[in-house]
């Protein structure tokens, strides 16, 4: 597995496994166990996914039975909006760690850029200093919100997890994050199937030239840009397919063809839309 080195020296796998919308806990536990068997070492969950306990059970089983050591794994979870704030963040972190069955978390992210994010960040900085978290970061933060945290705090975010796929490539945001030493991590790399992405003729043709699927082309494109990516599947054969992306390389022409697909628009929603802020900010 290839890694990136975060701005605090922590190594993070480039390719991981996400569990968003895997709400059946037995299915989630089984999926994470399968992912670990396939070779994934980065597992990404969140308090709002309501499956941290299943992830923790799968990780615990793997550590007991597979020969994996805790240091082989990189576990991420996220703080939800309702828990933003200094004291609430510490309480939420303890709940997540109990669900996960861990003593130390590899990466803790503020899930959305709303509420008392500065209070949350102060708590996360303390947990980081206490070595209960190896790295701290954010999710869905626009560049101005990232800079706000950098300017007014001691510790800069190590990661910003954002929607990123061929139709929303985040070129300018990626360049900004690189300048600030913040690692971009992509959620929804396949745009959840929108835009008929798996039948896109450009991506399909590139895949055919390498004997690879559209999904593999997309993942390879992200990896070659140095972006961490966390595809999700509950099917082991699809996990294996998504993992088989280190044995080929896209040339400059293919990268250019994919670059031309960019619409610079979210396939889901605008995190600055007041209606979206209200919707996410009032979810529990």
Regions found by a protein language model. Give the residues of each.
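Beta/alpha (TIM)-barrel catalytic core signal, keyed to glycine-rich beta->alpha loops juxtaposed to Asp/Glu
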Residues: 112-284
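CE4/NodB-like, metal-dependent polysaccharide N-deacetylase domain
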Residues: 7, 89-109, 126-130, 182
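A structural motif
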Residues: 40, 102-105, 133, 157
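N-terminal binding-site loop/beta-alpha segment at the start of enzyme catalytic domains
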Residues: 1-73, 190, 278, 284
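Short, well-ordered amphipathic alpha-helices
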Residues: 53-64, 93-97, 124, 146, ...
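Acidic-and-aromatic substrate-binding clefts and catalytic sites of carbohydrate-active enzymes
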Residues: 22-26, 46-54, 82-87, 113-117, ...
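Short, acidic/polar
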Residues: 23-36, 85-100, 144-146, 168-169
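A short, structured active-site edge motif that brings together acidic residues
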Residues: 69-83, 106-113, 140
């Amino acid at each position: 597995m290839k890694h990136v080195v975060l701005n605090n020296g922590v190594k993070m796998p480039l390719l991981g496994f996400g569990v968003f919308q895997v709400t059946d806990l037995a299915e989630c536990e089984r999926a994470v166990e399968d992912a670990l068997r396939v070779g994934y070492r980065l597992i990404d969950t969140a308090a709002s996914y309501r499956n941290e306990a299943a992830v923790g059970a799968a990780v615990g089983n793997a550590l007991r039975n597979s020969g994996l050591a805790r240091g082989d794994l990189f576990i991420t979870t996220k703080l939800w909006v309702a828990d933003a704030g200094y004291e609430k963040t510490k309480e939420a972190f303890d709940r997540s760690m109990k669900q996960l069955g861990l003593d130390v978390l590899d990466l803790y992210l503020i899930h959305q850029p709303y509420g008392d994010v500065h209070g949350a960040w102060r708590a996360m900085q303390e947990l980081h200093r206490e070595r209960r978290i190896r790295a701290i970061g954010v999710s869905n933060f626009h560049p101005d919100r990232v800079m706000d945290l950098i300017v007014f705090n001691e510790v800069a975010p190590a990661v910003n997890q954002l929607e990123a796929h061929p139709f929303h490539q985040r070129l300018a945001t990626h360049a900004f994050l690189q300048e600030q030493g913040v690692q971009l991590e992509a959620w929804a790399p396949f745009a959840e199937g929108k835009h008929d992405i798996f039948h896109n003729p450009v991506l399909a043709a590139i895949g055919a030239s390498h004997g690879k699927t559209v999904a593999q082309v997309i993942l390879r494109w992200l990896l070659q840009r140095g972006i961490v990516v966390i595809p999700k599947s509950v099917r082991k054969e699809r996990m294996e397919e998504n993992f088989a992306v280190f044995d080929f390389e896209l040339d400059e022409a293919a990268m250019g063809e994919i670059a031309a697909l960019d619409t610079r628009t979210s396939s889901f929603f605008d995190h600055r839309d007041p209606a979206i802020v209200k919707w996410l900010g009032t979810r529990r």
